[in-house]
Amino acid sequence: MKLTCMMIVAVLFLTANTFVTADDSGNGMENLFPKAGHEMENLEASNRGKPCHEEGQLCDPFLQNCCLGWNCVFVCI
C-alpha cells in the first residue's frame, strides 16, 4: 500500500514538473496573468499603497511582495 502511494505521488510530481518546465515557444507562461496596461507603463505607481520588502527581508513567494527589482524566494534577493 505504501509503495502504491509513493508511486502515485511520484507520477503526479513528475507530471507537474514536466508541465512547469516544458518549453513554451510562445512565452505563454509569461502571459498567464498579464498586468493592466497602466501598471506596465508606470511600475512605481502600481506598487503604491502596497507594502513591499527590501533585499534580505522575508517575503511571500506566492504574493511576490518584494520591492521593485527584487525576486522572492522566501527572502527578497
UniProtKB/Swiss-Prot annotation:
Domain of life: Eukaryota
Main location: secreted
Keywords: Disulfide bond, Ion channel impairing toxin, Knottin, Neurotoxin, Secreted, Signal, Toxin
Keyword Disulfide bond: yes
GO cellular component, one term: extracellular region
Pfam families for this protein: Conotoxin (PF02950)
Tissues where the protein occurs: Expressed by the venom duct.
Protein name: Conotoxin Vc6b
Native source organism of the sequence: Conus victoriae (Queen Victoria cone)
